[in-house]
């Protein structure tokens, strides 16, 4: 029997395992992918972080991860002195945030972090397995059945089961009460929720990212994708031009904006408002010795796929959606290589080369798609817009302060276009807390969400889904499972009984160095988010 079984090897799963191990409880990670880390590694998405991340607003273990990434570059790359000596080294100088790094580096660093705990037998990892069933007895899960790509199955018995998958795989097989898609205003009372009925199909777009480099004077054009003709002229009704193009819909105003691959000059803020610099994860200018090329991650607005929702249909629908998302990315690459207007005149960038070394794949595409939302538990407490949204909290100067806080985070409610045909929704939010009640399912006693499956709504998921918050949620979940085992209590009892809650929060703050409340900071408005505008000082 395994004490803590973590289904999913993403950031939340890694953080959960690390927390449980640090508290002395052995655990098992069941990872569908051979790379652990999820969005930061196998999905090839560099960190989406808030403006204060270098000072506060993350757990000590997440800060340690960030430091180790920077140390990896200092130890292994020929950095110029100015870059090497910068405490807040940003390997890629990407506009997305202060730490844009290569996906494979994140994976290696995470492996290094877990290595001593694996050596001690406190963490075990099974790779290439996915939840396929569960044995539920009463209000407890006794075991999960996992299956690999060859159809081989095995049963895993445990005390606590954590769902750290993007889609909520454990929630499905264990029949945990959950929600998909967008809730209605009648259900949640949220200011920006749907005014009509709830829409399970209203699921955010997924993105199949890829890594790219430039090899001047070479021809790297990929074979013409089978679906290229379809995607070449594809234009949703709310988009300002064909998706295979340089016009995008502004994430806040929905006005048309020109976003080419490259620009010759920066804008008035000093940043290049182009695609190449958006998620650049390695900047050649920071390397000695004539480094051949930058490396950038293509995970751009025009690459969002939402035609078929991943959830609510059948297995064939999901498989088709994933295949189409990958084909859409290939089509965008082919368009850039052959037909795209160039910043220096002419058409096509044949010198664009997929960089599989960064993603661990032969074609340069990420190992896994970036999935923004999946199943969310029906929780004892659900975080709604009125807890964190600026417009939804008139006259208040911060987010809701939760008695049962188990961590903190910050991001705007950033919703990408959805499968129901809705455009982006981007809402100001206050730096927020993670309530323990959002980690407790309404029925099952030994299932804990360890990431995006927590008790949020369609709206608040848009803020709680990002890297440092997923890490913090997973860390709290792993600590909760360990605490309940050692204290012979349950998650619900831990929350409901004041002395138990205070004891658990003391474990979080003293043994794991997790902040439970924010200092006072301003709201995350369009001028206070990393992206393509300068961030204002706090």
Predicted regions and their residues:
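Beta1/beta-strand and adjacent pyrophosphate-binding region of the FAD-binding site
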Residues: 1-10
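Nucleotide donor/acceptor-binding cores
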Residues: 2, 25, 159
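A short, glycine/Asx- and small/polar-enriched loop/turn
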Residues: 135-142
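Conserved N-terminal/central alpha/beta ligand/cofactor-binding core
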Residues: 19, 26, 31-129, 133, ...
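N-terminal Rossmann-fold NAD(P) dinucleotide-binding loop
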Residues: 13
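Flavin (FAD/FMN)-binding glycine-rich loop and adjacent Rossmann-like elements that form
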Residues: 39, 127-128, 140, 147-160, ...
């Amino acid at each position: 029997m395994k004490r803590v079984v973590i289904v999913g090897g993403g950031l939340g799963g890694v953080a959960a395992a690390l927390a449980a191990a640090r508290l002395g409880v052995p655990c098992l990670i069941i990872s569908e992918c051979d790379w652990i880390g999820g969005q930061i590694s196998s999905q090839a998405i560099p960190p989406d972080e808030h403006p204060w991340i270098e000072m506060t607003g993350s757990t000590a273990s997440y800060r340690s991860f960030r430091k180790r990434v920077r140390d990896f570059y200092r130890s292994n790359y020929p950095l110029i002195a100015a870059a090497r000596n910068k405490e807040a080294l940003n390997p890629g100088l990407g506009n997305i945030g202060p730490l844009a790094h290569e996906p494979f580096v994140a994976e290696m660093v995470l492996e290094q972090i877990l290595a001593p705990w694996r050596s001690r037998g406190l963490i075990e990892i099974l790779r290439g397995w996915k939840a396929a069933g569960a044995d539920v007895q009463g209000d407890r899960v006794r075991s999960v059945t996992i299956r690999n790509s060859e159809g081989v199955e095995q049963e895993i018995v445990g005390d606590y089961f954590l769902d750290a998958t993007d889609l909520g795989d454990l929630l499905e097989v264990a029949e945990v009460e959950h929600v998909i898609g967008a809730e209605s205003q009648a259900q949640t009372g949220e200011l920006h929720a749907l005014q009509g009925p709830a829409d399970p199909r209203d699921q955010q777009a997924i993105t199949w990212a890829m890594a790219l480099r430039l090899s001047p004077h070479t021809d790297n054009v990929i074979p013409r994708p089978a679906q290229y003709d379809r995607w070449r002229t594809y234009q949703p009704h709310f988009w300002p031009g064909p998706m295979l193009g340089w016009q995008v819909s502004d994430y806040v105003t929905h006005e048309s904006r020109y976003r080419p691959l490259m620009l010759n000059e920066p804008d008035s803020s000093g940043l290049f408002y182009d695609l190449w610099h958006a998620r650049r994860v390695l900047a050649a200018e920071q390397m000695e010795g004539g480094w051949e090329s930058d490396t950038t991650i293509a995970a751009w607005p025009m690459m969002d796929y939402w035609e078929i929702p991943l959830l609510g249909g059948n297995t064939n629908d999901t498989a088709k959606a994933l295949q189409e998302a990958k084909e859409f990315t290939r089509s965008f690459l082919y368009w850039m290589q052959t037909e795209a207007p160039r910043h220096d005149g002419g058409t096509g960038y044949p010198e664009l080369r997929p960089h599989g070394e960064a993603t661990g794949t032969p074609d340069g595409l990420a190992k896994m798609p970036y999935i923004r939302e999946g199943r969310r538990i029906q929780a004892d407490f659900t975080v709604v817009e009125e807890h964190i949204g600026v417009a939804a909290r008139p006259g208040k100067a911060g987010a809701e302060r939760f008695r049962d806080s188990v961590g903190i985070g910050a991001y705007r409610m950033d919703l990408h276009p959805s499968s129901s045909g809705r455009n982006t929704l981007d809402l100001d939010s206050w730096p927020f807390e993670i309530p323990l009640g959002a980690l407790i399912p309404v029925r099952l006693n030994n299932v804990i969400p360890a990431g995006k499956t927590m008790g949020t709504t369609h709206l608040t998921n848009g803020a709680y889904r990002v890297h440092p918050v997923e890490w913090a949620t997973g860390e709290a979940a792993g600590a909760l499972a360990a605490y309940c085992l050692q204290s012979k209590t349950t998650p619900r009892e831990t929350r409901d009984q004041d002395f138990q809650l205070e004891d658990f929060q003391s474990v979080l703050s003293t043994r794991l160095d997790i902040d439970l409340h924010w200092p006072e900071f301003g709201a995350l408005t369009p001028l206070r988010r990393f992206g393509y505008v300068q961030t204002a000082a706090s």
